């Protein structure tokens, strides 16, 4: 781990037909060892669409972690200041995280018109339910079933308040990500899905510390269901996309542009106002782009996402 390796670097370009990759050698480089923390927000930007007055916010969000909700709110503040008309939420690679962060994201999308409405409800087993456990997470309300969480209230100041969003999804999209889809649909916000059927994890976990054989173990058993304001929780087989396309086997284009196939479909949908009907020729990398940049709004900083689950804090009981 303390040494370095020599690797060959190649560049991938595309022939004029937009579908045939060309690999060009760029020589060798020495790659040394270093520490890297995967960011939760890979990209946030605002783009315009030629021939329209649309301003589209794009967020590539990789993991729900309460330690970085301030950065999430900062991204939406940039969206708000530029008066975005539409939102593309890219959750293709987001497999979950903290319930509270999911509620913050829901608040940032929904805004003041939905303040106080139920975003998500947690349901435990019969014994814990009879004991009064379980409860609601509400839009813009800091009091939750877990604890008081100030960012839920603060998020209203940065919310974009949209009635319709576009979400890019895959089989990896799970748990807290699916909670966003389900929670917003429970508020009758239109959530249009593009990609693959999601993972189908409609349950959550809690951290519990236990001692065995003089060792401490932190366990995360599945302990609760997550449902929306309408009581819907039956998505164990995943959410089926409105436009189904598998981009997992291709080399991705630049995120948030027409070079990314799922992003392309979302932008075409936003521009036309109609769900695209896919044809083979429409999924190549050639042709003109109806999109123009509306600013270079990258927000990349080393942060650590909590992935793989809908999670609540650990207990030592």
Which residues does each PLM region occupy?
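Flexible loop residues that form catalytic
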Residues: 92
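C-terminal, low-ordered peptide segments at domain boundaries
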Residues: 1-84
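C-terminal "post-core" interaction segments
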Residues: 53-86, 95-317
